[in-house]
């Protein structure tokens, strides 16, 4: 068995020289959580009988989807050459939506284990996280995982990794998180190669928050990394960005179950409990200091998480509105990036406009609402935030098509992203075609090896939030991977397309789209509604319009009764009289008639295909 530390170093009395803080960065599905499981087992912090797969992923959704959403920090003892060391492993999310959380986790470390699947090679998020690690000046240990797979090509990818970060292919460690091969060698290498944390134990306390989780019984549990000074229980602490003060009720380390300690010293990673009930009180990236002896300046790199994608969430059953409100409030306790405000739609009733970090964040939030609170929800098509400047120089921020101003508009700005796409080189043509059709501008292209290409595009966020990723996967047989980050904005020719039913606007179907795509959207939506709305006694025109200009039209034909059925033969004038009378009646009906759009039509027209399948079940 492994050389576990016989006497684990005690928190608060640990010399920073024997501490090693590291995180594991990898693309989704490259075996990060499995490797973490093996480390927990080999260092002896989790007993063999308590071991379960993905030990650190606590949420059901995390386990089911096999993704990590919240960061976790674990303290593990390890012994090398007769000396005991304390290793702090910080598990990070791998998905692009949670990049800010990853960057804060990286800032809490001195080193990173760059994990790459030996059967799949380097992917877009591996690169994105690697660049983040390099920006934070971390020491990087390259590791190939899953070498037990029959499809593994360790030699090929070791050369690719060495080429990417500089170094020798021989230095790339080969491990298997599943069987445990090479994990001890990796732990030894972490102790040997990673630098110890540096800080001043006598300076005022400064600790960086890299995650905060809401616990039903204890309130908010804040995970911190101490940079300078010491933190002790029962002290009063202050958050430097909000200036809020709290009493430290409990302080300790996770290994991996929470273990209270007498304090935390320089370089140590642990948790704080202050009894606060709202996660927004302890923001990721903020600095914690001692109220009695506060630090003069906070640690750099703090930023507010900014929502990128907005969507309306409406309960199918209007009476569930209060339940949805409470559910969103509770989720906000655990997710500082979630923002919402109430909104009403003439068509869908009362609901909320919710802001998310990205599509995965939207999907997970919606799934948690449906699963944990038994809600049935309709979500409208995702939108981004546009900045509309009117001719009188007034600026309006629009996240919902119904807020789009009708007056004279001088310009509309839309958010842009830098997208990095990695794919085998045979798909370059179809990827370029897709990006150009989405108004992307090419920024560069590099060959990582003879058969893998990195494409860089500057592309509007609105074009990638809906179905871009699905199309990219289908065009590349699932081989491409995508990573993006917000990158400025541009002036664009955007218009609001309204859908009119018998001359009346239906707010739920309006969309903000590029002028070139407006016609296609109008034709698609009018066609869809023609199929979905039941026929009436009179003809119903469905029109798509930009302002007052109609760009597309479909008609739902009237149902008519055969008024001539009772005439057997007889004079033509008699028949004409009956037909004229029917025509008059239809005309009158059309003047006063209202078209009721059934709920099913709304759901079918608004949902993407994936949620449609859900609705069928």
From Swiss-Prot:
EC code: 3.6.5.n1
Membrane topology: Peripheral membrane protein
Enzyme class, spelled out: hydrolase
One CC-aspect GO term: plasma membrane
One biological process term in Gene Ontology: positive regulation of translation
GO molecular function: GTP binding; GTPase activity; ribosome binding; translation elongation factor activity
Reaction(s) catalysed by this chain's protein: GTP + H2O = GDP + phosphate + H(+)
Keywords for this protein: Cell membrane, GTP-binding, Hydrolase, Membrane, Nucleotide-binding, Protein biosynthesis
Superkingdom of source: Bacteria
Localization of this protein: Cell membrane
PROSITE patterns found in the cross-reference section: G_TR_1, G_TR_2
CDD domains reported for this sequence: EF4_II, EF4_III, LepA, lepA_C
Major location (coarse): membrane
InterPro entries: EF-4, EFG_III/V, EFG_V-like, EFTu-like_2, G_TR_CS, LepA_C_sf, LepA_CTD, LepA_IV
Protein's UniProt name: Elongation factor 4
Naturally occurring in which organism (per UniProt): Paenarthrobacter aurescens (strain TC1)
